Amino acid sequence: MAAQNAFEQKKRAILNEIDSTQPDLSPKGTIDELCLPIIDLINASADMVTTSSCSGRVSVFLEGTKSYNGEVKIGGKGQGGKWLYVTHDREKVIGWLDELKSKSEFSFELSGKEIPTEKVTGSIRYILYKYEPFILHVKCRDFQAASKLYNTAMSCGFRESGIGSNNLVAIRINIKLDVPLGYLDETSGTLKFFVTPEYVSVLDSLSLSKFDENTRKMQALYDRIEKELINCAPDVNSKVNITPIETKEERRERKKREGMERQRQLKSPQNVL
């Protein structure tokens, strides 16, 4: 009962936060509109509550300083990392480069030239283009509820999903892009792209395709959750036998009965030589 009360208290607190007009901690500051239907669906269940979400986004990120106390952290974001561009809106993918150039504090060089060999070090601050798909975290009342949600997500192709501590289910899919576009020349303060504008257009087209695939997957997940977890009352006319889950005590008693039955059969006259 205490665990149930703790879950219900947590759920009430989360739902109050969702209803609040205060910005959240994400770069956008609000729940993505595309996530609202599936969030509302899941939160309608007494056994689940959503804790965080992202409907999918395109971002351009400038890595921060990677050296710390004389050590270089390869590939780390480090200190001073900066979001150059972020959008969760499919319609705002095309044209991000022009918008970034008009607003950025940096100057730009789109030469398409490779990085000079002498500058390729572990401390270089790369410009990273990313498409990140839908992700949803759901806290469940117990492991049984978490397992049902996990299995439902996996059956829809969300193969990166998992169950963490406290019955927290992470629903993820691997349709991402993660591509370096250039680097920051810290001497001149210039963002130097070693890809061409044409290559950026190719990435944008790929991202649009991934947005579309992502939306289809989200809809498939919504439909499956609605069918299997929300509107899942058994059909009284169904011929399928539904086997109830055994408790530990029931399993212990069954094993005891089976053992006694085996002993009885071994002692029967037909088994005596």
From Swiss-Prot:
Q: Which GO terms describe its molecular function?
A: tRNA methyltransferase activity
Does the UniProt entry include the keyword Transferase? yes
Catalytic activity, per the record? 4-demethyl-7-[(3S)-3-amino-3-carboxypropyl]wyosine(37) in tRNA(Phe) + S-adenosyl-L-methionine = 7-[(3S)-3-amino-3-carboxypropyl]wyosine(37) in tRNA(Phe) + S-adenosyl-L-homocysteine + H(+)
Cited InterPro entries? tRNA_yW-synthesising, tRNA_yW-synthesising-like_sf
GO CC, alphabetical: cytoplasm
Could you tell me the superkingdom of the organism this chain comes from?
A: Eukaryota
Residue span of region Disordered? 243-273
Q: Which UniProt keywords apply?
A: Methyltransferase, Phosphoprotein, S-adenosyl-L-methionine, Transferase, tRNA processing
Pathway, according to UniProt? tRNA modification; wybutosine-tRNA(Phe) biosynthesis
Q: Where is the composition biased (Basic and acidic residues)?
A: 246-264
Please state what class of enzyme this protein is: transferase
Report the sequence similarity comment from the record: Belongs to the TYW3 family.
* Misc. remarks from the entry: Present with 3390 molecules/cell in log phase SD medium.
Physiological role? S-adenosyl-L-methionine-dependent methyltransferase that acts as a component of the wybutosine biosynthesis pathway. Wybutosine is a hyper modified guanosine with a tricyclic base found at the 3'-position adjacent to the anticodon of eukaryotic phenylalanine tRNA.
Name by which UniProt lists this protein: tRNA wybutosine-synthesizing protein 3
Protein's organism: Saccharomyces cerevisiae (strain ATCC 204508 / S288c) (Baker's yeast)
